[in-house]
Amino acid sequence: MLKSSSLNKCCLAVIGAFSLFSAAQADASTLRIAMTAADIPLTLGQPDQGYEGNRFTGIPLYDALVEWDLSQGEKPSGVVPGLATEWHVDPQNQRRWIFKLRPDVKFHDGTLVNADAIVWNVGKVLDKAAPQYAPGQIGNTLSRMPTLTGAEKIDDSTVALTTSEPDALLPYNITNLFIVSPTAWEKIYAAVPESTGDTAARSKQAWTTFASQAVGSGPFKLEKLVPRQQLILTKNADYWNKDRVPKVDKVVLIPLPEANARTAALLSKQVDWIEAPAPDAVDQIKSQGFKIYANTQPHLWPWQFSFLEGSPWKDIRVRKAANLCLNRAELKSYLGGYMTEATGVYEEGNPWRGKPTFQIKYDPDTARKLMTEAGYSESKPLQVTVATSASGSGQMQPLPMNEYIQQSLKSCFFNVDIKVTEWNTLFTNWRLGAKDPAAAGINAINVSAAVNDPYFGMIRFATEKAFPPTATNWGFFTTPETEKLATAVKHAFTPAEMDKAAGELHAALVDQVPFLFVAHDVGPRAISPAVTGVVQPQSWFIDLSLVSKKE
């Protein structure tokens, strides 16, 4: 439980941070949420701050062609129609997908969402010759859809997306491409003085301005953005999906990266909802009538190992030893039960689990035996360095968790050094890879990962095509077997084929242990009893449009 002195200090800090809020923002029409991010995620279409950005700026402000079903929490979230009502791979060309668009959907500025708008939005991240090309949005986008190569208008309500190779996973991938209003952006671009510079300079300025005047087609509209302080969203009463017209008039999003500060904000009723409460504060939070929501998520909290020459993790005995030395059940207890033990990317019961030969469990004696075989001992420990963050999307409680791992691995002849940086910086460095100067002296990185589908959960960590900066194979791990199996997954265009291919890839991945498999998050959040209608899906995301707030 939080000590009273710490809580009092946090309360004072929070009261100061919230002094800019008006009394009206505490009424029943306004939902106030404290995020783990240190800044407001980008609002210009392609969010940063990991999937907390998609959760709080992408999904509320925008729509995608294909979206996640966040309406229930009894089973894993699947994809459902968004701006596209249907899609299929071209039977004559498996590198071409056809999407039929939903009729009569309008952006917040009243203009239509049509095929031209979709092509324009693909151009913002792919077409270097287009005025709207936004290099600053590429890193948050293309690593999540690396095979996408272009878009073609077939007619006003039909668009084709092309890929560099057959890719059965594209519908999952494009849940990350949020569609902004071309007309709104072009008006801003036209107003940028030519004296600003060339097309690229004017475009950059236009996107900067657009961030505070964002226009999408989502259930919420942007009212006010104050970087590092707050984002105010307002209800889109004309939203096309009547089941998702928001129940509250406004949402105020506040960045509060420190868990104790978030807890203090909740207990002092400065906010209605906090992400990732501190585990030692959960009993105190519950005792004051707040509710803890949690559910299984397609999430992995790992250490991702470097496979560069000179990295100690190239020795599979070392990789296996680290995985066998960690008591995940004890860590779960330490976190108040708010995690699931990771024995792979996918657990028993998941159709993509397969049948790994190597069993990840707590077996410190075998771990020490492996380390001894590898040449290490209590008097000659292995020095390893992991990079992590103090907070961030999906990072759970990164500092206490890494400190626990540090102490645990010490008993198996590991000497762990922890390097801490700001979340967005760590996330950027993750995409740059282990060869980048930012990774100097680091041989493992702790970045939580969404594992919604076989690309996100496996392919982007196990193939040469996913080497940085294309995707997030930070450690440059690959084997001929994972390459072959990843190709089979991409060519699996039926559910049965996908389950078989993905299961075989997962078994191979676990057997090669490119990660320290630690935990799966359950996404705990603490919410005021005045807030109702919360659906905690089995997802990284949540639908704010379903939420109500009473007096």
Model segments located where?
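Gly/Pro-rich hinge or "lid" segments in bacterial periplasmic/extracellular proteins
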Residues: 69-74, 178-243, 365, 369
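Aromatic- and charge-enriched surface segment that lines or borders ligand/interaction sites
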Residues: 86-132, 154, 160-162, 265, ...
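Surface-exposed binding/hinge segments that line
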Residues: 100, 139-198
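Detector for C-terminal structural segments
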Residues: 34-37, 50-51, 56-59, 226-231, ...
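Structural transition elements
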Residues: 220, 309, 337-374, 390-401
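A bilobed periplasmic-binding-protein/Venus flytrap-type ligand-binding module shared by bacterial periplasmic
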Residues: 68-69, 234-239, 297-321, 325, ...
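Ligand-site clamp/hinge motif
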Residues: 102, 208, 238-284, 415
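N-terminal lobe/hinge region of extracytoplasmic solute-binding protein
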Residues: 35-92, 215
